[in-house]
Design a protein with these regions (language model features):
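Short helix-loop boundary/capping segments at the starts of domains
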Residues: 36-39, 43, 66-74, 94
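PLP-dependent class I/II
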Residues: 2-15, 21-25, 30, 37-43, ...
Length: 391
C-alpha cells in the first residue's frame, strides 16, 4: 500500500498538465546555454536577448535609494502609487495628447504580470485572441495558460511584416475577445502606421496594444492605440526605454469597467508592485529625457551598422526595421531550420542569437538579432558569424 501511495505521489503524477505542456521560452534557453559556456571559459557575445546594455540612469537609482532610506518599503495601493499613476497619465498626455485617469492604471512587477492579469480577466475557456505570426513568444503561451485560444494572422516579409486589417477580419468569430499587436514590434522591429492602427481599432473586438518599445523609434513616430479608441488595453513598462529590465516595473491602462476585475486578481496574485521601485519609476518618467535621447542615438547607430553587416554576410532584410532594437533577418541562404542554426552559431561562432521559430511558425527560416549591445561587440559578432558561415 505504501509503495502504491509513493508511486502515485511521484513528481510525474503531481505536475499539472499546464506546467508539462507549456512550451519553453527559447531565447532563455539560448541565453542559459550561453551562460553555461561562459562558465567553462568561452567568450560569448550576446545578441539573443532584448536587454539594454546601458546602465539604469543615475537619477532613477538615486530615487530608489532615497525611497529605500526613507522607509518606503511597505505595501502600496494594489493599483500602484497614485504619484506614479498620475505620472503615467501625464506622460501619455504630453506624448500622445490622450487623457486617461489614474484610476485606469494598474502598476505591476513588469509588463508580463499585466498580460497574465488581463488574459485572466478577459478570457473564458475557448475564447480567442487574434495575434500576429510572428510575434512575442509569450503572448500565445499566456493565452493558452488561462485556457484561451490564440488565433494567428500571418505577417510576411513581402508585406514588410505589416499586420493587415483585411487579414485580421477574416479571423474574427463570436469567440473573439481581442486583437493584440506590438508596435514597435518584437521580433520584426516594424511600426504600424496611424492609418493601419485606426483601421484595426475599428474592427470591433477589444484591442490590446503592447507599447513596451515606445520611445525606441528611429524614423517616423509611434502611436498609442488610445489615440484611436477608448476600448483598448495598453501594456507598457520601464525595462526597455529606461534600461530597467532587472527592476521589474510595468503597468497596464484599461477601460474603466475592467479595472476592478484586474485589481481583484492582482490583489490575490501579487498584492502590489515593489514600493521603492515605483518611486524610481516616477524619476524615470520625469528626469531621464537626456539619457534616453542619448541611448536612442546610440541604438540607431548600431541598427544601421548591423543591417549593413548582415546584408554583407548574406542574410535577407527586405524592409529595414525602424523600432525596438531587433533585426529579424531571413536566414534561408544558410538553413531552413532556425533552431538548429541558432544553436550552431552559438556553439561554433560563440554568438547568441534567437531562432525565428520562437516567435511562431512564420518566424521559421529567420534569425532575430538584438543590437542592445556595444558597437564593438556587434562588429566582433558579425565577424565571427561571417567566419563560421564562410563568407
Amino acid at each position: 500500500m505504501e509503495s502504491e501511495i509513493f508511486d502515485y505521489f511521484r513528481a510525474s503524477n503531481m505536475i499539472s498538465k499546464k506546467a508539462i505542456h507549456i512550451p519553453p521560452f527559447i531565447v532563455m534557453d539560448v541565453m542559459e546555454k550561453a551562460a553555461e559556456m561562459e562558465r567553462k571559459g568561452e567568450n560569448i557575445i550576446h545578441l539573443e536577448v532584448g536587454e539594454p546594455d546601458f546602465d539604469t540612469p543615475a537619477c532613477v537609482k538615486e530615487a530608489a535609494i532615497k525611497a529605500f532610506r526613507d522607509g518606503k518599503t511597505h505595501y502600496t495601493h494594489s493599483l500602484g502609487l497614485i504619484e506614479l499613476r498620475e505620472a503615467i497619465c501625464e506622460h501619455y498626455f504630453e506624448k500622445y495628447n490622450v487623457k486617461i485617469s489614474p484610476d485606469q492604471v494598474l502598476v505591476t512587477s513588469g509588463s508580463s504580470p499585466a498580460m497574465l492579469l488581463l488574459f485572466s480577466a478577459l478570457l473564458n475557456p475557448g475564447d480567442e485572441i487574434i495575434l500576429p505570426n510572428p510575434s512575442y513568444s509569450c503572448y500565445s503561451k499566456l493565452i493558452e495558460f488561462v485556457d484561451g485560444k490564440p488565433v494567428w494572422v500571418g505577417v510576411s516579409e513581402e508585406d514588410g511584416f505589416q499586420y493587415l486589417p483585411e487579414k485580421i477580419v477574416e479571423k474574427i468569430t463570436k469567440r473573439t475577445k481581442g486583437i493584440i499587436f506590438n508596435s514597435p514590434s518584437n521580433p520584426t522591429g516594424n511600426i504600424l502606421s496611424a492609418e493601419r492602427m485606426r483601421e484595426i481599432a475599428g474592427l470591433g473586438p477589444l484591442i490590446i496594444s503592447d507599447e513596451i518599445y515606445h520611445g525606441l523609434v528611429y524614423k517616423d513616430r509611434e502611436h498609442t492605440i488610445l489615440e484611436f479608441t477608448d476600448m483598448a488595453f495598453v501594456f507598457n513598462g520601464f525595462s526597455k526605454l529606461y534600461a530597467m529590465t532587472g527592476w521589474r516595473l510595468g503597468y497596464t491602462i484599461v477601460p474603466d469597467e475592467f479595472i476592478r476585475p484586474l485589481q481583484k486578481i492582482h490583489q490575490n496574485f501579487f498584492i502590489s508592485a515593489n514600493a521603492f521601485v515605483q518611486w524610481a519609476g516616477i524619476a524615470a518618467l520625469k528626469e531621464t529625457k537626456e539619457e534616453v535621447a542619448k541611448m536612442k542615438e546610440i541604438y540607431n547607430e548600431r541598427r544601421k551598422f548591423m543591417i549593413s553587416r548582415l546584408r554583407e554576410i548574406g542574410f535577407g532584410i527586405t524592409v529595414e526595421p525602424t523600432g525596438a532594437f531587433y533585426v529579424l533577418a531571413n536566414a534561408g541562404k544558410f538553413s531552413g531550420d532556425s533552431y538548429r542554426l541558432a544553436f550552431d552559431i552559438l556553439e561554433n561562432a560563440k554568438v547568441g542569437v534567437t531562432p525565428g521559430i520562437d516567435f511562431g511558425s512564420n518566424g521559421e527560416g529567420y534569425i532575430r538579432f538584438s543590437y542592445a549591445n556595444s558597437l564593438e561587440n556587434i562588429s566582433e559578432a558579425m565577424d565571427r558569424i561571417a567566419d563560421y558561415l564562410e563568407i
